[in-house]
């Protein structure tokens, strides 16, 4: 049996990985079992209860900076807050703020269904799950969910601009950015942009 001497080197994700059948499979082959992708487990995790005792919070500006720092700490690279028009809040619940997190994505998760292609999705789900849970612990409503207007909310929250296709283009990452699940909350926050009807 051969003994490995020295560190294991993997040619990924360097440019030399193009054409590597294992790398291509890692990115592009749909998973055989959804339980092999952490994203499905996080999506199915039940939301915790809202703390019945509301925390004594700071001003909306300070609270917003704390929430953003938490999101950065748990893996988000871009974080912004958009105010959502109350009459457009959807199911009648007034959750006037949308916290939008985004992460760099070398490969678009919508086009790369393999385990590797879903890394930005998994990381984004983890970040939004933790932030929403923390807000509920503060005694406020918060829910993280897929939103068909996520990229529009991201632009309204100052994370970038929308291109002609309606996709987010971030200053730092260009189009190589994944917008995570959107957190809707009634925690008093300071929006980074104008109110958005959705």
Regions found by a protein language model. Name each.
Residues 1-83, 90-95:
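Iron-sulfur (Fe-S) cluster-binding modules
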Residues 77-198:
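Catalytic cores of enzyme domains
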């Amino acid at each position: 049996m051969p003994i490995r001497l020295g560190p294991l080197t993997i040619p990924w994700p360097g440019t030399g990985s193009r054409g590597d059948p294992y790398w291509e499979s890692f990115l592009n082959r749909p998973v055989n079992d959804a339980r092999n992708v952490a994203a499905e487990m996080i999506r199915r995790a039940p939301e915790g209860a809202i703390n019945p005792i509301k925390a004594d919070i700071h001003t909306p500006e300070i609270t917003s900076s704390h929430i953003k720092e938490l999101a950065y700490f748990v893996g988000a690279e871009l974080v912004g807050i958009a105010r959502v028009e109350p009459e457009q809040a959807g199911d009648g619940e007034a959750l006037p703020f949308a916290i939008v997190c985004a992460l760099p994505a070398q490969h678009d998760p919508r086009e790369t269904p393999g385990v590797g292609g879903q890394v930005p999705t998994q990381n984004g789900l983890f970040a939004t799950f933790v932030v929403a849970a923390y807000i509920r612990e503060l005694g406020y409503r918060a829910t993280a969910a897929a939103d068909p207007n996520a990229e529009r909310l991201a632009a309204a929250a100052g994370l970038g601009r929308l291109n002609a296709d309606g996709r987010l283009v971030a200053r730092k990452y260009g189009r190589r950015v994944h917008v995570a699940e959107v957190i809707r909350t009634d925690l008093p926050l300071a929006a980074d942009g104008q109110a958005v009807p959705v």
